[in-house]
């Protein structure tokens, strides 16, 4: 919030699959913002287009990815090297005016013209989807999810958040392991 993150403010997140990725996503939502998931394996031109098209104000990333990122106007926060600064902020719950009709995230599709197209997803849509999927097929604290999908694909919200809301376990699988055929 000290960086101006509030409802309808878009925050990019371009990180490798890790626990820090989940912390970053939850931090954006908890601050009241909406995230724009950016796969670090995307071509530089595509990432640049998405950052500019979305008007991303803040970009969460990791220090090792900085050389690969296109130039952009967003303020950068590295979840690894800026950890001390992040930890210096209060640990209390943040107050926000986020409602069901506010944006949760903007995900980019390939687009019918070949240019990526942003699709805005509201909190109500995410919550309704997760609540339904929690009941059918039915999940419990005894279940374990393997999150293998890139965060730039919409099913990632199911893989990451559903286990958390039902008290189950989520294992964030690295890109290397998730794509290994063996």
Write out the residue ranges for each language-model feature.
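Charged (Asp/Glu and Lys/Arg) segments that form or flank catalytic channels of large polymer-
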Residues: 159
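Carrier-protein-dependent adenylate-forming modules in NRPS/ANL systems
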Residues: 1-127, 131, 135-141, 145, ...
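Conserved adenylate-forming
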Residues: 147, 179-182
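Short beta-strand element of Class I
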Residues: 170
């Amino acid at each position: 919030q000290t960086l101006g993150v509030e409802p309808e403010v878009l925050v990019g997140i371009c990180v490798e699959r890790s626990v820090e990725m989940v912390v970053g996503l939850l931090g954006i939502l908890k601050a009241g913002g909406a995230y724009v998931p950016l796969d670090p394996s995307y071509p530089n031109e595509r990432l640049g287009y998405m950052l500019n098209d979305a008007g991303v104000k803040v970009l969460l990333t990791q220090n090792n990815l900085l050389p690969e990122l296109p130039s952009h106007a967003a303020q950068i926060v590295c979840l690894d090297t800026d950890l001390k600064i992040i930890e210096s902020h209060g640990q209390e719950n943040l107050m926000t005016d986020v409602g069901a009709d506010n944006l949760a995230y903007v995900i980019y599709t390939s687009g019918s013209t070949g240019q990526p197209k942003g699709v805005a997803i509201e909190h109500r849509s995410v919550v309704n989807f997760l609540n339904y999927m929690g009941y059918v097929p039915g999940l419990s604290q005894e279940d374990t999810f393997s999150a293998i999908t890139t965060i730039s694909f919409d099913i990632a919200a199911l893989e990451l958040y559903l286990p958390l809301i039902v008290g189950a376990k989520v294992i964030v699988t690295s890109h290397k392991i998730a794509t290994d055929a063996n």
